Swiss-Prot record:
Gene3D superfamilies: Pleckstrin-homology domain (PH domain)/Phosphotyrosine-binding domain (PTB), PPM-type phosphatase domain, Ribonuclease Inhibitor
Annotated motif PDZ-binding, positions: 1694-1696
SMART domains, alphabetized: LRR_BAC, LRR_TYP, PP2Cc
Chain's gene name: Phlpp1
Regulation of this protein's activity per its record: Insensitive to okadaic acid. Deubiquitination by WDR48-USP12 complex positively regulates PHLPP1 stability.
Molecular function via GO: metal ion binding; protein serine/threonine phosphatase activity
Name of the molecule in the record: PH domain leucine-rich repeat protein phosphatase 1
Span of domain PPM-type phosphatase: 1138-1385
Region (Disordered): 1-97, 222-398, 1422-1473, 1610-1696
Broad enzyme group: hydrolase
Entry's cofactor comment: Binds 2 manganese ions per subunit.
Length: 1696
């Protein structure tokens, strides 16, 4: 609902004026994090200045993004490999030009390069300085941001920190950097501000206001607290060039960031408009007396002496937004075109530029010794002669003693003396302010004495960082803005209470249409909140604005004019405006939006989530308001500005009935609301209230009073005057007993005291409250109920005691109880009175005895699952109205026969018990849902399916069934069974004919039985079948009669012996077909695939060979999985680990999980696996999938401690999620295998980290060992932490109704209740470790860890094991998306590293690769790159397997191939390297063998768009002429070369060569290079990403394809088609390049002749002695040197 607003004329700014640029930028910002722009850098003091001078004169300082010294665009790089000395290598920016692909702008996947080149040339980069010496310094510049919306922002500049700035920060832990969005600058900079923990918000704001529109670089504002004792003197003598980096190239114009003054306390005064001064009343601190990190959100001052440290559970406090405000706070039109400033913005924070006088600068007289601070300075601040810190926050000297105050000043830089500040303050209409924004939501103005750096550090500690130096490094990353951001001045996007929805310039006419006087004129029209605003003159910045209230009015179509609407207001003085729109689209948009506004009630106003500090003036235009929503703001009772309206003005609304002030961080009860006698509903939840005043008794008409989420311990006795109060919310406070005043509130019928601190419940207090019927005491710490000889409590009908610590519960005293909740306690016995009992919830206890007396005749729902019951109580069978009975997960051995005779029973859940059989002789039963899975049932009752004529659902999986009972004894049947789950039994072929007795069967799961055939005649009768799963049997074929099942949409038959491809492609409705792990050799496809087919899985069929036509047809499927070509066998040594993964969609066929599998992470010595679960969102899992490996690689270079690098990886990932993580979230688990970093020759270490419900289980000696932990409200420490943060836990156990997990990635708007800090556990791998499993939430909700380990322990293939887990979970009742990764281990006693990894080691010899004979991959070095390149151990090792057509080859080469320079030449012409000694763990990595490694160009980009695929690219004509396809996996990181050999053996490329990393050239030679299958090379076409992860189903066009001759068919080969030469298969040369190409070809022919001569000379020589096989392969590769286009000019650098 939009606010009723009418803006006065003077409050509307010109949309085209100067205020529009920052307004639009702030609106586009939306809390998003602008990514770092990485470009080539030179060492400080080197050619950085030259790079700056090369920038255009009209541009701000710094080179173009991605350029250095005139070089072309660069791709993003990963973390630079540290050199021997620990410093990152810095490559000089060499000359070079872009390739043809880059010149044509078709490198669309590398969005970072495109964004850099298209952005304003004023973007600053790091070219002026040097790359940081440590890897941690460059981490923020090397990884990508997942905030893709940042690309849409215009006029956004980013000033980056130089190495000198970072060194200054690292010099002391008291220093840091905050990134401030400087609204005062015309180009809207995100400016880094270097400061200390003592720097106040007033100082920072005033310094930025001082710079104003002049621009500037990095600003340094030093605080005035006591300096550290160990601070070196040199740190204060920083040169001017390091203190500030101005936008102008000449150094003389650089601005000093700050001038140090003496230590003193922060000011408490603020200058007010007109130059007046007043004492600013600080806001009441809602937190406890000790300063806590939570004060950053509550507005409390931070102690300057408190050192930053990790926030403990008892100290941290911050309020979370309510769950209902998640969806209503987004306003995409806020501060859009024509946005106006709000009243409080113009009154409190105008964008006035702070300028100094025009006279010469005044330099104070220096003295040899500084004067100590005056004790009076911290107590008082005189307005006439301010010292130390001016009211504007500018740092000044105090007099002659300030020697060090100006020591860092550069010559020619004016200093701000007290005299100049007073003169400036008189010109300033309001004090400068600094604002803080969390998670892109509401923005709070910081008090003058608050410390921005302290606030930022406390926030990062709350996230989970444990070390101050790491918090310091994280604060220097600009991407932190998506989590916490500072603004200099109130941002327009959050400041406007009249939210702009639509605006534009249209033809407007006022009055009646028939009057000829009113002609059409072009005017600015704005739909703002609930008002239509029309400018009176053409230039909307001048003249008055006409405001037309729309609530109660009407909007009508004008038929006489095209695209014309008539807007009319209500009331006797209604006016009408006719607006003619330019297009029909705009016409419809305005019609729909205004129609909604006009239909609203004029008495209701919604101003929630508007960052209001005081009530806007237009709110008081109408005194007839009845409903006012002001939640999620920062309203104050007494604003500091005199013209502002505080909460005291609310009493002017004499008709107000409903007022919502929740989540306003008030700290004290707003006493003004007690003067509103008409108020019937008041919500002051989550305001850190510690007491309720006695004046509330005056609100005698109040009916609903919400006080949840505060610090209340008592209530005033005056509440008894609220005779009409019917609902009082006291949940999540600090009550230890029931307040006595409730005894007199006779209209209150529900006691809401969940989440308090009650340990005992005195029933005597409830006896004195006969009006209470519903008692809610969940989430307390109740241990016992004290009766005190109380009679029966007949008035209590509903009792909720969930999540307490009760051991026994005797509820017989509640003789009229109807609903009892006692889940998740520690109950052993439970006694209940059953007279009126209707529902019993007692799951997740330890019950062995359950007594209900008398028999509950009204009981309809009973849940006693997950207890220790050994039998079903007798009284259950006598309960005649029982409809749902859940007795699962107990120890019940037998079900009584009378239970099935209950005519009311509809649903019986008895799974996970010890049932050996069901009652033999069943009478007719009304059960519709019967679940008896996970028992020991050998056979079902013979008459079960005949008597249960109402049965629709039967799940008997995981039993010992060998046959099925018949459904009928005749041909006719009355069965209505629709879903039948019989997975994991011992059923044989004999039971298949019995299935025909269920003609209405829709879902049939018979996986993992003993089926050998499925008769065709029986399949033909199941015409209604929609889903069938017959995996894990011994079937050799699927009957052709499956074509009769016209409604079939899912066919799952993996892990069989199927040899013939079934007729599933004839099914019109088929969507998913899984035939993996079979023995298919060929497939038969129709001319046209089924229109709805989305997934086809053919992996694990080693004999399958596809021809080109079939492959071309199958590539049109959204998710087509097939085995990858084998990666050449490197050494024949057994692998230590191999993996298989699978995933399945959940409801609505939506895949919300993702997997990550990197077998050769970080140079083949490590492995990385992960599973990510987004619950119901798709975005977060895929963002985690493509980024976490990069982050982990960077963190490994910063620390070697297992827990620390894993924790930091998850926390940094929280930042990398960007705006996607503000509203969405996802669970994650990562497993990292590596050697001990200290002892590389030692055993392997497996480190697992998880958040959410994704978990890891290790099988050791056949027993499960859990390596994960699920953090929910059932965890005692988590429950305590959440309750301290006053988050609201809903009845389903979710934080603010959003998520059950209290530790999870994303959901940053729930901070600090929900944090990303993971659980980390490390184990040393031993020969007894067989495998480990990573699974998503759906897997572990359906399978226990013991069952999962037992199920796959004897499955030899990792892929088949993962498939089995997924199938079992689905058959056991999982409806969520599932992902499972199984990693098999082969750790032996001698599993230690014996590789010679020294610098003087030798390179391994080459060997045959995977490429076809007519294709060779030539990796060229990039001498023109000035960026530090990522090492092969940068953690981005992965598997590249994706697909695109030949016409799209050109756009994919640049994006999927790595731009990392190789360790050695990969072409067959590269010199032979001597053999290197390797251990079995690290086999020899051959130069032509394929080693999967991530392309840093693809996944290290800051703006990589995961949504782009090859269909988005434009084909380049002239590259290929035929349409043949051959899948090629690019070998880019196979060699581990030593530094000395790298310099010797790299390909020699001319300096003018393009930076294109891969050249694919055709070769006429054919050689029968053998290919061997790798056990871990189970992949997909269109499903595997370059990091080995599983991409979304839509992204299925990522494989690099080359036009070439097809390989000959071999056993186990990939294709079955012979070579098909095409006469048109030739290179097409553009006419303008013919002459140049001729010269190149001529030069090439000369080289070939020279090579032939050399070969002839070698043949004349005597034959050499016999060579080993590897040397022979190397010589053969040398002889088959392909045509390398190394010497092509830049314009002809297209991969051919």
């Amino acid at each position: 609902m939009e606010p009723a607003a009418a803006a006065p004329a003077q409050r509307l700014a010109d949309p085209t004026g100067e205020d529009r640029a920052p307004a639009a930028a702030a609106a586009a910002e939306g809390g998003r994090s602008p990514d770092s722009v990485l470009s080539a850098a030179a060492p400080s003091g080197g050619n950085g200045g030259a790079a700056r001078e090369e920038a255009p004169c009209e541009a701000p300082p710094g080179p173009l993004p991605g350029r250095a010294g005139g070089t072309g665009r660069r791709r993003r790089r990963g973390v630079p490999q540290p050199a021997a000395g620990g410093a990152a290598p810095v490559t000089a920016a060499g000359g070079g030009a872009n390739s043809l692909l880059l010149r044509r702008g078709r490198l669309k996947r590398n969005l970072s390069a495109a964004a850099s080149s298209s952005s304003s040339p004023s973007s600053a980069s790091s070219a002026a300085g040097g790359l940081p010496a440590s890897c941690s310094a460059s981490a923020s510049l090397c990884t990508r941001s997942l905030d893709r919306k940042t690309l849409l922002q215009k006029h956004r500049q980013l000033l980056q920190l130089q190495p000198s700035d970072r060194d200054w920060v690292r010099h002391q832990l008291q220093r840091g950097c905050v990134h401030v969005f400087d609204r005062h600058m015309a180009s809207s900079y995100l400016r880094p501000v270097l400061c200390t923990l003592d720097t106040t918000a007033a100082e920072v704001a005033a310094r930025l206001l001082q710079l104003g529109h002049k621009g500037g670089g990095v600003v340094k504002v030093l605080g005035h607290g006591p300096p550290p004792a160990a601070a070196p003197a040199a740190s204060d003598q920083t040169p001017a060039t390091e203190l500030g980096r101005d936008v102008e190239p000449p150094p003389s114009s650089s601005t000093v960031g700050a001038v140090r003054g003496p230590a003193r306390a922060p000011p408490a005064d603020l200058p007010l408009p007109g130059g007046a001064w007043t004492r600013c009343a600080p806001r009441v601190n809602p937190a406890p007396s000790d300063s806590s990190p939570g004060e950053l959100f509550a507005g409390g001052p931070c102690s300057p002496s408190r050192a930053p440290r990790p926030a403990s559970d008892t100290e941290s406090f911050s309020l979370s937004p309510s769950a209902e405000s998640v969806s209503d706070r987004l306003d995409p039109y806020s501060s859009g075109g024509g946005s106006s400033s709000s009243s409080e913005e113009l009154e409190a924070d105008p964008a006035t530029v702070l300028t100094g006088p025009s006279g010469p600068p005044h330099h104070p007289v220096r003295s040899s010794q500084p004067r100590p601070p005056s004790p009076k300075t911290s107590a008082l601040l005189q307005p006439k002669a301010p010292t130390g810190v001016d009211g504007t926050g500018l740092v000044v000297g105090e007099g002659p003693g300030d020697d060090k105050a100006v020591a860092a000043a550069a010559p020619g830089v004016p200093l701000w003396t007290p005299g100049r500040i007073r003169e400036t303050v008189q010109k300033t209409s309001s004090p400068p302010s600094l604002y803080v924004q969390l998670h892109g939501e509401t923005t709070r103005r910081l008090e003058a004495d608050e410390k921005p750096l302290q606030i930022q550090n406390d926030y990062l500690f709350q996230l989970g960082f444990g070390e101050l130096w790491r918090v310091q490094e994280e604060g220097m990353d600009s991407e932190i803005g998506c989590l916490i951001r500072f603004y200099a001045g109130k941002p327009h996007s959050t400041g406007s209470s009249e939210r702009i929805q639509l605006s534009g310039m249209y033809n407007v006419r006022k009055g009646k249409m028939q009057l000829p006087v009113n002609r059409w004129t072009r005017r600015q029209v704005i739909l703002c909140g609930t008002c239509l605003i029309v400018s009176s003159v053409k230039d909307s910045s001048s003249g008055k604005m006409h405001v037309l209230p729309l609530i109660g009015g009407k909007v009508e179509e004008v038929k006489k004019h095209q695209h014309c609407l008539a807007f009319s207001s209500s009331g006797p003085q209604s006016q009408t405006y006719y607006i003619c729109f330019d297009t029909f689209t705009e016409y419809l948009r305005w019609l729909r939006q205004v129609s909604k506004v006009a239909s609203q009630r004029i008495s209701s106003v919604d101003l929630s989530c508007c960052s209001l500090e005081h009530l806007p003036a237009n709110l008081f235009y109408s005194q007839d308001l009845t409903h006012l929503n002001l939640k999620q703001n920062f309203l104050r009772q007494n604003p500091s500005l005199p013209a502002a309206r505080g909460l005291g003005e609310l009493q002017r609304f004499t008709k107000l009935k409903s007022l919502n002030l929740s989540n306003n961080h008030l700290g004290a009860f707003p006493s003004a609301v007690c003067s509103i006698p008409t108020l019937a509903e008041l919500n002051v939840s989550c305001n850190a209230l510690q007491e309720v005043p006695a004046a509330v008794g005056a609100m005698q008409n109040l009916q609903t009073f919400l006080l949840d989420g505060n610090f209340l311990q008592s209530l005033p006795a005056e509440l008894e005057n609220m005779h009409q109060l019917s609902y009082l919310g006291l949940s999540f406070n600090e009550f230890t007993d029931i307040p006595e005043v409730l005894e007199k509130l006779t209209a209150v019928d529900k006691l809401c005291m969940a989440g308090n601190c009650m340990e005992t419940l005195r029933l005597q207090a409830l006896r004195r409250m006969p009006h209470i019927k519903h008692v809610d005491l969940r989430l307390n710490i109740l241990r016992k109920l004290i009766t005190d000889e109380v009679d029966f409590l007949q008035h209590v009908t509903q009792l909720d005691l969930r999540d307490n610590k009760l051991g026994d519960l005797d509820a017989m005293i509640f003789n009229n109880i109807e609903v009892l909740h006692c889940e998740r306690n520690q109950l052993v016995t439970l006694n209940i009175c059953g007279y009126f009992l209707k529902a019993l919830y007692a799951s997740s206890n330890e019950l062995v005895q359950l007594d209900v007396y008398p028999v509950p005749n009204y009981l309809s729902y009973m849940d006693v699952s997950r207890n220790c019951l050994e039998s079903v109580p007798e009284w259950v069978c006598e309960s005649r109205k029982l409809e749902v009975l859940d007795i699962g997960h107990n120890q019940i051995c037998e079900l009584p026969a009378r239970l099935f005779c209950n005519s009311s029973l509809r649903k019986l859940l008895a799974g996970h018990n010890r049932l050996a059989r069901l009652p033999e002789r069943l009478e007719r039963t009304s059960v519709e849902v019967l679940d008896v899975q996970h028992n020991q049932i050998i056979e079902l009752p013979p008459n079960l399916l005949m008597k249960a004529d109402s049965l629709r659902f039967l799940n008997a999986s995981a039993n010992k069934l060998e046959t099925l009972p018949p459904a009928t004894l005749s041909e006719e049947t009355s069965s209505i069974l629709q879903e039948l789950y019989l997975t994991n039994n011992s059923l044989t072929d004999k039971c298949v004919p019995l299935l025909t007795g269920h003609p209405r069967l829709k879902i049939l799961h018979m996986a993992y039985n003993r089926l050998q055939s499925f008769p065709a005649s029986k399949m033909a009768k199941l015409e209604e079948l929609e889903e069938i799963d017959i995996s894990g049997n011994k079937l050799k074929a699927i009957p052709t009669t499956i074509m009769n099942c016209r409604r079939m949409h899912t066919v799952i038959a993996h892990s069989n012996c199927i040899e013939v491809f079934p007729e599933v492609m004839q099914l019109p409705e088929v969507k998913c077909v899984d035939l993996s792990c079979n023995e298919l050799s060929e497939i038969t496809l129709p001319e046209n695939l089924p229109p709805k087919l989305q997934e086809l899985d053919l992996t694990g069929n080693p004999r399958l060979a596809l021809d080109h036509k079939s492959l071309e047809l199958l590539n049109n499927i959204r998710c087509f999985k097939i085995d990858q070509p084998s990666a050449g066998d490197a050494s024949g040594a057994p692998a230590v680990w191999s993996h298989g993964y699978t995933e399945a969609s959940g409801v609505k066929n939506k895949l919300c999980v993702a997997a990550l599998s990197v077998n050769n992470f970080r140079d083949n010595r490590e492995a990385l696996y992960g599973v990510f679960d987004g619950d119901r969102n798709v975005e977060v899992p895929y963002l985690l999938q493509c980024t976490m490996s990069d982050i982990l690689a960077e963190e490994l270079q910063k620390t070697k401690n297992e827990e620390e690098y894993m924790v930091n990886t998850f926390i940094v990932m929280q930042r990398k999620l960007g705006t996607a993580g503000q509203k969405l979230g996802g669970a994650a688990v990562l497993c990292h295998i590596r050697h001990d970093p200290v002892d590389l020759g030692g055993s392997f270490t497996l480190t697992s980290a998880n958040v959410g419900k994704c978990q890891t289980v290790l099988c050791r000696n056949g027993k499960p060992l859990s390596l994960s932990r699920s953090y929910t409200m059932s965890c005692e420490e988590e429950r305590k932490r959440i309750k301290q943060h006053k988050a609201i836990i809903t009845e389903d156990g979710k934080v603010n109704g959003v998520t059950e997990s209290t530790r999870i990635l994303g959901y940053t708007f729930l901070h600090p209740s929900v944090v990303p800090r993971p659980h980390v556990q490390s184990v040393l791998l031993t020969p007894q470790d067989e495998f480990f499993i990573l699974g998503s939430k759906g897997l572990w909700d359906s399978l226990s860890i013991e069952e999962a380990v037992e199920a796959v322990r004897n499955v030899p293939d990792a892929l088949a094991a993962a498939k089995k887990l997924c199938t079992l979970a689905q058959s056991y009742g999982c409806h969520d998306s599932i992902s499972a990764v199984v990693v098999q281990l082969s750790v032996t006693e001698d599993s230690f590293c014996c590789c010679e990894l020294s610098v003087g080691g030798s390179m391994p010899p080459p060997s045959p690769g995977i490429f076809p004979p007519s294709v060779s991959m030539v990796i060229k070095d990039r001498p023109s790159d000035g960026l530090g390149v990522p090492s092969s151990s940068s953690g981005m090792a992965s598997e590249i397997s994706s697909e695109l057509s030949t016409s799209e080859m050109s756009s994919e080469v640049g994006s999927t191939a790595s731009d990392e320079p190789p360790s050695g030449a990969l072409s067959e012409s590269s010199p032979a390297y001597p053999s290197e000694q390797r251990c079995m763990l690290h086999p020899v990595c051959l130069s032509n063998s394929f080693q999967r490694q991530l392309s840093s160009a693809t996944f290290s980009s800051a703006f990589s768009d995961n949504g782009l695929d090859s269909d988005d690219e434009e084909p380049i004509e002239g590259v290929f002429s035929n349409g043949s396809r051959v899948e090629v996996e690019v070998d880019i990181h196979c060699s581990r070369a030593k530094e000395k050999e790298r310099q010797q053996h790299l390909l020699q490329v001319p300096a003018e060569a393009s930076d294109e990393g891969i050249v694919i050239s055709a070769n006429e030679d054919e050689s029968g290079l053998s290919k061997k299958t790798d056990i871990s090379a189970v992949g997909t076409i269109g499903r595997r990403r370059a990091n080995g992860s599983v991409p979304p189903q839509e992204r299925s066009h990522n494989v690099i394809e080359v036009a070439t001759d097809a390989p000959l068919r071999k056993p186990g080969g990939y294709f079955a088609a012979p070579a098909q030469p095409d006469p048109d298969d030739q290179f097409i040369i553009p006419p303008e390049l013919e002459e140049e190409v001729k010269e190149i070809m001529k030069h090439h022919q000369e080289q070939q002749q020279q090579q032939q001569q050399q070969q002839q000379q070698q043949q004349q020589q005597p034959p050499p002695p016999p060579q080993p096989p590897q040397a022979q392969a190397q010589a053969q590769a040398q002889a088959q040197r392909p045509f390398q286009m190394d010497h092509l000019p830049d314009c002809y650098d297209t991969p051919l």
